[in-house]
């Protein structure tokens, strides 16, 4: 695997070709392995290299290959990570068009792509379109799956985020609570995603001035994060800071100083 380690440290085109040819020959172009390598490159933050990799793979596929829609989706993720939001939307739209031609209207891929499109609109500050896309994802998943499908937790969380940004705090709270309820069904009690949900709910209570409820949810978040994350993880530091600010608003300056300093 030395060829892979070498290539991941370089963005040069000849290194990319070397890596791609190696993977194609070793794994006979098995989709799972090629996808895994592309994901590894992307997750390392080497977005330009990931884009070249996906494009090279795309160029070798016949026009009717079922992997094309997946590659469009992955290119959309790369463009999103690079902050190229309009390009990301174009890739996602291409992926969506293929899925709508080749799958039933309630297929999981279609709902997931609507969610991805919503994420990009949210980053562009277009909350209306983001909410529209998230609601489409929810509607499709309700038709095809149980209302407590794990992905619904993500959709509800995203809707809650939009409502919080729009200062519709009670609506935000409702969707964050729905997201948390689903996560509890599938995740271990100390999973970091539960810590995120408690933190999000605490943030909304903060906006509503419900400081005792804020501290309750921040404490729950902190307990989970201390168990599941490295000691120096920024989410832990953020939770301490948030709790310190709440104590400051409650005029408990001693506790505030301990947490903030």
Region annotations inferred by a language model:
Residues 25, 63, 102-105, 147, ...:
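Structural signature of alpha-solenoid helical repeat scaffolds
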Residues 29-60, 77-83:
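Alpha-helical segment of the N-proximal tetratricopeptide repeat
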Residues 35-43, 66-81, 108-123, 150-165, ...:
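Conserved alpha-helical positions within TPR/SEL1-like repeat arrays
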Residues 57-59, 96-101, 138-143, 180-185, ...:
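Amphipathic alpha-helical segments of tetratricopeptide repeats
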């Amino acid at each position: 695997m030395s060829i892979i380690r070498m290539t991941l440290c370089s963005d040069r085109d000849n290194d990319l070709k070397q890596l791609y040819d190696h993977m194609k020959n070793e794994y006979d172009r098995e989709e799972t392995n090629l996808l895994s390598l592309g994901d590894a490159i992307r997750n390392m933050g080497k977005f330009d290299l990931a884009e070249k990799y996906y494009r090279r793979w795309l160029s070798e596929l016949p026009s009717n290959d079922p992997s094309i829609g997946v590659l469009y989706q992955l290119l959309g993720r790369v463009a999103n990570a690079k902050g190229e939001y309009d390009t990301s939307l174009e890739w996602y739209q291409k992926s969506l068009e293929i899925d709508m031609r080749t799958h039933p209207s309630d297929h999981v891929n279609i709902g997931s792509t609507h969610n991805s499109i919503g994420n990009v609109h949210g980053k562009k500050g277009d909350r209306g379109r983001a909410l529209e896309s998230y609601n489409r994802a929810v509607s499709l998943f309700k038709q095809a799956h149980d209302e407590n499908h794990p992905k619904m937790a993500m959709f509800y969380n995203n809707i809650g985020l939009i409502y919080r940004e729009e200062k519709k705090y009670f609506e935000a709270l409702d969707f964050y609570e729905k997201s948390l309820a689903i996560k509890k069904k599938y995740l271990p009690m100390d999973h970091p995603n539960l810590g995120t949900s408690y933190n999000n709910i605490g943030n909304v209570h903060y906006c509503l001035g419900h400081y005792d409820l804020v501290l309750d949810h921040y404490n729950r978040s902190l307990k989970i994060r201390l168990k599941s994350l490295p000691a120096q993880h920024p989410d832990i530091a953020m939770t301490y800071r948030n709790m310190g600010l709440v104590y400051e608003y409650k005029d408990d300056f001693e506790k505030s100083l301990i947490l903030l300093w």
